[in-house]
Amino acid sequence: MARRPDLQSGPERLAALVRSSIPPMHSAGLPFVGASLAVALLGRKRRWMRRAGLISAGANAAFFRHPPRVPPTRPGVVVAPADGLICLLGEATPPAELGLPDIPMQRVSIFLSVLDAHVQRAPIGGEVVAVRHRPGRFHSAELEAASEDNERNSVVIRTPEGLHIIAVQIAGLIARRIVCDVHVGDKLSIGDTYGLIRYGSRLDTYFPADARVLVSHGQRTLAGETVLAELA
């Protein structure tokens, strides 16, 4: 009979500790880390070039980190789609390009700095019924006008109860590339990874006006874990 690896000591234990301490990286970061390592390799005889390449590789690996998260199991909750800081709370109409009724919904806006993990997660489980990209400007994502003026990508998720929850990826001053990996008809579970925005951005989450908001301005959020609201 094969011997079971001893995870209490030895190399298996060390490998397990490394895996638990260092979060994995989203696949979108591989080209950036690879290019940085190539610079370090090509410039290995020049100290400054080698150091710059290694620093860039480390920074990109940190930016594209994809930490594991444990979503809540209780039904009827909306979780944060992104790590970051809540910068806006209130009612607003959903993006016009979605063609939804012009009725105000609750909106929670999360600002992501370059130090936050930029992987986005589904705020609720359900079916993707719309994905719309709209070109725009690249103003600071902290500004309220960014919801209207900046480039954005909207994903509408319909819950089994027929409610629409909207997650809007908004490009920022530095962020110039929105990545969305879901399509109409896809089924998502709460907390599933569905995209990212490169280098600083914002996420707006829209949900029904009668939902009970559970977060406050200035609060930090963890994607897939922090509960933004309870649905009525």
Swiss-Prot record:
Record localization: Cell membrane
Main localisation: membrane
Named cofactor requirement(s): pyruvate
Site (Cleavage (non-hydrolytic)): residue numbering on this chain: 200-201
GO biological process: phosphatidylethanolamine biosynthetic process
Gene Ontology molecular function terms on file: phosphatidylserine decarboxylase activity
Gene Ontology terms: cellular component: plasma membrane
Known pathway: Phospholipid metabolism; phosphatidylethanolamine biosynthesis; phosphatidylethanolamine from CDP-diacylglycerol: step 2/2
EC number per UniProt: 4.1.1.65
Transmembrane segments annotated in the record for this chain: none
Topology in membrane: Peripheral membrane protein
Active site (catalytic residues): 201
Root EC class: lyase
Keywords on record: Cell membrane, Decarboxylase, Lipid biosynthesis, Lipid metabolism, Lyase, Membrane, Phospholipid biosynthesis, Phospholipid metabolism, Pyruvate, Zymogen
UniProt PTM: Is synthesized initially as an inactive proenzyme. Formation of the active enzyme involves a self-maturation process in which the active site pyruvoyl group is generated from an internal serine residue via an autocatalytic post-translational modification. Two non-identical subunits are generated from the proenzyme in this reaction, and the pyruvate is formed at the N-terminus of the alpha chain, which is derived from the carboxyl end of the proenzyme.
InterPro entries: PS_Dcarbxylase (IPR003817), PSD-A (IPR033175)
Catalytic reaction equation(s): a 1,2-diacyl-sn-glycero-3-phospho-L-serine + H(+) = a 1,2-diacyl-sn-glycero-3-phosphoethanolamine + CO2
Note on how the cofactor is bound: Binds 1 pyruvoyl group covalently per subunit.
Quaternary assembly: Heterodimer of a large membrane-associated beta subunit and a small pyruvoyl-containing alpha subunit.
Function, as annotated: Catalyzes the formation of phosphatidylethanolamine (PtdEtn) from phosphatidylserine (PtdSer).
PANTHER family, per the entry: ARCHAETIDYLSERINE DECARBOXYLASE PROENZYME-RELATED
Homology family: Belongs to the phosphatidylserine decarboxylase family. PSD-A subfamily.
This protein's name: Phosphatidylserine decarboxylase proenzyme
Organism: Mycolicibacterium smegmatis (strain ATCC 700084 / mc(2)155) (Mycobacterium smegmatis)
Source taxonomy: Bacteria, Bacillati, Actinomycetota, Actinomycetes, Mycobacteriales
